[in-house]
Amino acid sequence: MFITKCSLHLKSFDLDVLKDSCALILKNKINLQNLKLTGPINLPTKIKKITVLRSPHIDKKSREQFEIRTYTKTIQIESLTKNTNDIINFMKQFENSFFFGLNIKVVFTYKKDVLL
């Protein structure tokens, strides 16, 4: 059983943090030759709107709206060989990197050879 693909799903409220982290990941790819990087792929921005009353007692018509935007990108890393250490070594480079304000979800895809 070996890792064939790794998907990084990146989410942030701040678009600049998201762009900087994607640039850092793409910059570190230069060291490894056996990996194919696809992305960053922009996913739809989720907008959550919250409406509140301006005054606590009267004037129901007077309201204020706030919104929270969640930006999402994904990067896919594929291994060109059956060596699983390439993807793991690539991911260990970011183990000590701190991305403040960034949510990272890592999904690994495995493949198993069947001998008949």
Swiss-Prot record:
Protein name in UniProt: Small ribosomal subunit protein uS10m
Gene Ontology annotations of biological process type: translation
InterPro entries: Ribosomal_uS10, Ribosomal_uS10_dom, Ribosomal_uS10_dom_sf
Transmembrane segments: none
Similarity-based family: Belongs to the universal ribosomal protein uS10 family.
GO cellular component: mitochondrion; ribonucleoprotein complex; ribosome
Pfam family, one: Ribosomal_S10
UniProt-listed HAMAP family: Ribosomal_uS10
Localization in the cell: Mitochondrion
Domain of life according to the entry: Eukaryota
Gene3D superfamilies with a match to the protein in the record: Ribosomal protein S10 domain (3.30.70.600)
Molecular-function GO terms, alphabetical: structural constituent of ribosome
Major location category of this protein: mitochondrion
Alphabetized SMART domains for the sequence: Ribosomal_S10
Gene transcribed to yield this protein: RPS10
Keywords (A to Z) from UniProt: Mitochondrion, Ribonucleoprotein, Ribosomal protein
